[in-house]
Amino acid sequence: MSDKFHILLLNGPNLNLLGTREPEKYGYTTLAEIVSQLEIQAQGMDVALSHLQSNAEHALIDSIHQARGNTDFILINPAAFTHTSVALRDALLGVQIPFIEIHLSNVHAREPFRHHSYLSDIAVGVICGLGADGYNFALQAAVNRLSKSN
């Protein structure tokens, strides 16, 4: 049986340090644990999930470009690029793949420079402040949205 939907999960800078980097803000769950849980969830939903974590903006942009034509939805935690990257915004606009922006912490309850996102206004939705669970909610929301449109 072939997968019903193809979803790309992107994680930005420093998320490779999850579990040990400021756990009081980001939790003790590692990125590998988050991705593993999402893969199990996706398999049960007949969804192909691919993943990239990169500290390099260009690698995330290249992955977004490569997704055109073979990806139905993007889940992205742009991390610090949220507040700085017009290039990520332009890449997402360029491929016209719907996406959900994810943040582990509540960015609106943090430093003022974290309150602005270059992506939120073009995202289908934003999930923030729910820790690792936010990824599960985002995957479910993406599949629900795709199922309704097919």
From Swiss-Prot:
Q: Which Pfam families match?
A: DHquinase_II
Question: What Gene Ontology terms describe what this protein does at the molecular function level?
Answer: 3-dehydroquinate dehydratase activity
EC number(s) in its UniProt entry? Answer: 4.2.1.10
Q: List the catalytic activities from the record.
A: 3-dehydroquinate = 3-dehydroshikimate + H2O
Coiled-coil region(s) at which residues?
Answer: none
The record's section on NCBIfam families has:
aroQ, PRK05395.1-1, PRK05395.1-2, PRK05395.1-3, PRK05395.1-4
- State whether it acts alone or in a complex, and with which partners, per the record: Homododecamer.
- Please state what the protein is called: 3-dehydroquinate dehydratase
